[in-house]
Amino acid sequence: MSIFIDLEMNTTDVRLVHKKDLRNEIIEIGAVRMDEAFHPLDRFRIFVRPQYNGVIERKIYKLTGISNGAVSDAVYLPEALDALEVWCGSDGCEIYAWSNSDLTQLRKECGFKGIDSALLDEMVQWHDFQEDFRQMLGEKNILSLSNAMHR
């Protein structure tokens, strides 16, 4: 079983947290569960209420379509991770994302906020699909997701 994960983030407010400590916060977790032939089986989507910037930055809204209203009544990150963990199940799976930046963000944000998630321990089987895809195509440089979609 494979799960592709994508995180969307908003910048933090410098008045509330030092940028060097936490530049961004997760505002959405999306995932798709796929079978061995990579056919979609199920989808997961949950909005996450940011703690360190109550306003979705304009550039983030334009990029993601995520509005202030979408996150204002959303759950906080611990509850979102619990929901993702339940959705993932306990059968074990390979986790894929377009780069390692989502895993880095998840670990950094959980560390900063003191969140202990069993799901993070299970994400040792994390795959950087951007790198896998680059190797499959024999490319020297990594591709943006947008460029990869046109291949």
Residue ranges with predicted function:
Residues 14-16, 73, 136:
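Short, function-defining helix-loop hinge/capping sites that tune catalysis or transport
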Residues 22-29, 33-64, 86-151:
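Metal-dependent phosphoesterase core characteristic of DEDDh/y 3'-5' exonuclease domains
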Residues 17-19, 76, 139:
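Single-residue recognition of alpha-helix boundary sites
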Residues 1-37:
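Entry/capping segment at the start of metal-dependent catalytic domains
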Residues 61-81:
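Metal-dependent phosphoesterase signature
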